[in-house]
Amino acid sequence: MAKSLPLNSRSKTTALKQPRELFSYARDIDGKYVYDDPENSLSYYYLPDSTIDTGIDLQGGYSKFKKIPDEQNLADFNSLLKAIIKYETSEGKKISSDIITFREIMTKILSLPYNLTDPIDLYVVPFDGQLFIKSDDELDMKRRKEQEVRMKQTNTVERYDYMKRCEYVGYKFETIATIPKPWSQVSRSQIENRNKKVVNNYEQYLSVIRTGIGNVKLVLAGEIDCCWDYLPDEQNKKLNHYVELKTSRIIENNSQVVSFEQKLFKAWCQCFLMGVTKIIYGFRDNNLILKNVELFNTEEIPILIKNNPLTNAATEKKINCTNALKWYGAVVDWLNTTVDKKDETKSYRLKYDPVRKSFTLSETESETNEKLRNGELLTPEFTEWRQSLKK
């Protein structure tokens, strides 16, 4: 029997526990995960105005793009659980948390009140007194492939190629806007030759943070694009130095303002959840030339959206970050109280259906539960590790 949470559910509190980084790990150019000295994989932002003014072509190097296959670029629980084992080994105890998942999953939930057209399909697995939440990767991949087919069928060859180049520009912007170490440790040639560097989306630096809303504690893993200035030694101060990088088309009319506001809201969701304080947008024209760069402080975005005169009509569509946060709080609290975290005989499917406008939680079939507990989410290594902590 499925249980439903009405879409108008809102928590009374938006009290958020200040996110704190617990540890980090990384993925290298070969797609292998790195657990020792992951800071070596962190990039640093450096893009002076004089460089921006040169009119950088953000589709440059497109034909050489080293793109990771989509199947290998899903939120990977195997690597996260290995990183958790390493952290718990050093701490000598289990991470204190009610929910363990990836930032991108919670971003979908947080942004749902203003993104009612996209389906959500997740698995919730109770284990060792905690809820582990992952995407239904098989269904996600099926949808991605269907979307790709639709893009090809509904666009000319030229238009399809342009759309793929638009996807590339975000990675290109990251490449030309960052350096591998703090500025003082990087050679002039490294800085000047960034535009010639082969772009890839294999390399990732991932931060794992503890946060919470209301009475629920969460551990979230999410990709960090780069560091603003330097990385402090104190673990609990690192989040203030991280930056999210984004690209968007330059804004030339009112309808584009509304479209950008929706993008900015999604970026706010991503960064707010992780405690990332800065978002840098690279704005490009229709020819994919970088025209200007703008810095947004995460904490100021709700006010920017609220005070936008172009969307200030009193409608339900008007984005309200506090309203989204109250929905997120209601979902997290509902999961935490509805699912028995000690019952390891069951797993659940959490589903948002955009056609029925329903948000439901239902038990999976026993076969699915077995798969999730034996490699698809939980790994034998992690299960054994947690058992050893009880001895």
Curated annotation (Swiss-Prot):
Annotated substrate binding lies at E223, K246, Q270
Listed GO CC annotations: cytosol; Las1 complex; nucleus; RNA polymerase II termination complex
One of its GO biological process terms is: positive regulation of termination of RNA polymerase II transcription
Give UniProt keywords alphabetically: Hydrolase, Metal-binding, mRNA processing, Nuclease, Nucleotide-binding, Nucleus, RNA-binding
The EC number(s) given in the record are 3.6.1.-
Q: Which GO terms describe its molecular function?
A: enzyme regulator activity; metal ion binding; mRNA 5'-diphosphatase activity; nucleotide binding; phosphodiesterase decapping endonuclease activity; RNA binding; RNA NAD+-cap (NAD+-forming) hydrolase activity
Query: What is this enzyme's catalytic activity, as reactions?
Result: a 5'-end NAD(+)-phospho-ribonucleoside in mRNA + H2O = a 5'-end phospho-ribonucleoside in mRNA + NAD(+) + H(+); a 5'-end (N(7)-methyl 5'-triphosphoguanosine)-ribonucleoside-ribonucleotide in mRNA + H2O = a (N(7)-methyl 5'-triphosphoguanosine)-nucleoside + a 5'-end phospho-ribonucleoside in mRNA + H(+); a 5'-end triphospho-ribonucleoside in mRNA + H2O = a 5'-end phospho-ribonucleoside in mRNA + diphosphate + H(+)
Main localization is: nucleus
Origin superkingdom: Eukaryota
Top enzyme class, one word, equals hydrolase
> How, per the record, is the cofactor bound?
Divalent metal cation.
The entry's localization annotation reads:
Nucleus
**Cofactor(s) listed:** a divalent metal cation
Q: Which residues bind a divalent metal cation?
A: E174, D225, E244, L245
Q: What task does this protein carry out?
A: Decapping enzyme for NAD-capped RNAs: specifically hydrolyzes the nicotinamide adenine dinucleotide (NAD) cap from a subset of RNAs by removing the entire NAD moiety from the 5'-end of an NAD-capped RNA. The NAD-cap is present at the 5'-end of some RNAs and snoRNAs. In contrast to the canonical 5'-end N7 methylguanosine (m7G) cap, the NAD cap promotes mRNA decay. Also acts as a non-canonical decapping enzyme that removes the entire cap structure of m7G capped or incompletely capped RNAs.
Spell out the family assignment given in the record's similarity comment.
Belongs to the DXO/Dom3Z family.
The UniProt subunit note reads as follows:
Interacts with RAT1; the interaction is direct, stabilizes RAT1 protein structure and stimulates its exoribonuclease activity. The interaction also stimulates RAI1 pyrophosphohydrolase activity, probably by recruiting it to mRNA substrates.
Q: What is this protein called?
A: Decapping nuclease RAI1
What gene is behind this protein?
Answer: RAI1
